[in-house]
């Protein structure tokens, strides 16, 4: 596992959040669950640095992107 795999998954879920088929809230929940699992798997494999990088990826980037998408969805309602 590496950080690029996690980034691809987050980008995929972020794209889904902008489609009418999925709600942003459900994509946010899937993304948060995926990030948490990836971070825990990295810890289980003994790669603390990767786990920290995954957590920071969520905290510094994708959390805010999903929240912005959610705000956009609310503004359209």
Please give the residue ranges for each predicted region.
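Alpha-helical linker/edge segments of TPR/alpha-solenoid repeat scaffolds
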Residues: 65-67
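N-terminal acidic leader/helix
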Residues: 1-32
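Acidic, low-complexity, intrinsically disordered interaction modules
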Residues: 21-62
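Short intrinsically disordered terminal tails
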Residues: 1-4, 70-77
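Intrinsically disordered, low-complexity regions enriched in polar/acidic and amide residues
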Residues: 8, 48, 75-76
């Amino acid at each position: 596992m590496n950080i690029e795999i996690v980034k691809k998954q987050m980008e995929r879920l972020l794209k889904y959040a902008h489609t009418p088929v999925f709600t942003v809230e459900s994509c946010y929940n899937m993304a948060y669950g995926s990030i948490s699992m990836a971070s825990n798997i990295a810890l289980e494999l003994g790669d603390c640095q990767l786990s920290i990088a995954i957590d920071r990826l969520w905290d510094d980037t994708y959390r805010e992107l999903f929240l912005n998408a959610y705000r956009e969805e609310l503004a359209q309602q």
